[in-house]
């Protein structure tokens, strides 16, 4: 069987071209490590004066079972996430951060941003009932 996954970000206009290339190249390279070729394509789905969202879609074989499929997806996600951060995109986009993107949050927000997020979590969720650990790990 095949998997189809979309990885998305947003960036300002001067970065869009390099971002498209970086996401597609990272995805191809990650799946090549598993001996897999991928069909990938990118479109700009939300366009604004300041920049655009960048959606890259990857179609690839899931491999010989669940473990192989998960390993391929994790490689793809890690490579594309690293490329997003390296090229100045946002890992949050319109879907939020959550567990899948939390590892890149500090790289995007910096120490001050992470302190602000931690303060908001403490203020608005003092009892730790709202998705504890999703953004800040053990610090929540």
Regions found by a protein language model. Name each.
Residues 1-140:
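Conserved glycine-rich FAD pyrophosphate-binding loop
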């Amino acid at each position: 069987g095949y998997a189809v996954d979309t990885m998305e970000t947003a960036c300002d206009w001067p970065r869009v071209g390099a971002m498209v290339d970086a996401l597609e190249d990272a995805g191809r390279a990650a799946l090549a490590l598993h001996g897999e070729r991928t069909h990938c394509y990118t479109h700009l789905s939300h366009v604004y004066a300041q920049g655009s969202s960048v959606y890259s879609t990857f179609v690839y074989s899931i491999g010989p079972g669940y473990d192989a499929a998960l390993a391929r997806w994790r490689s793809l996600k890690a490579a594309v996430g690293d490329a997003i951060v390296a090229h100045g995109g946002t890992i949050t986009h319109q879907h939020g951060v959550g567990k899948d993107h939390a590892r890149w949050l500090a790289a995007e927000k910096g120490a001050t941003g992470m302190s602000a997020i931690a303060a908001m979590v403490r203020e608005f969720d003092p009892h730790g009932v709202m998705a504890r650990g999703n953004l800040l790990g053990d610090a929540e």
